[in-house]
Amino acid sequence: NRTVPVVILTGHLGAGKTTVLNHLLRHPGLRAGVIINDFGAINVDAALVQGQIDEVASVSGGCLCCLDDASQLDEALDALSHPKLALDALIIEASGLAEPGTLARLVWLSPVTHIRLSSVVDIVDAKRHFDTVDLGGVPPRRYGVASLVVINRIDELTAQERVGQVVRIEARIRQRNPRATIIHTRH
């Protein structure tokens, strides 16, 4: 009765989700299944990761958290978590439009019995974050759902920008979620 951990990978459009996913998939010995949610009919992200993963499923036609029902997601979770595949983990790469909390609830409430929600990883674009995701006021809800926040693209900031911008992003995350683990990465 083994359950397969599900990791939800979220982030705004262009934050670096596919880059982070590709990095994870290169980890030797990891047998992962990936569910990719591309917004639209052409699955660009699916093409980018083909050949690097053990099993893949794509859910298209809209943002996972906005679909009329979760049956496509449930079917993908069920197929990829089948015991015969013996995968170590399932990774859902969400559309940049996805609401992390809604997506986490869909996995949590899924009727698929051999999965468990492991974590929500939110990818943040250090350079464009305050122009795209966090526009001020109350910190975005997405921070509250994430168990891990990856502040990505810090290499695109000058040393001076890095100090101010990263500290500001971390402070906003901590306002909403003091327990989140925060790491920095280069694109």
Say what each PLM segment does.
Residues 148, 156-187:
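C-terminal accessory "lid"/substrate-recognition subdomains
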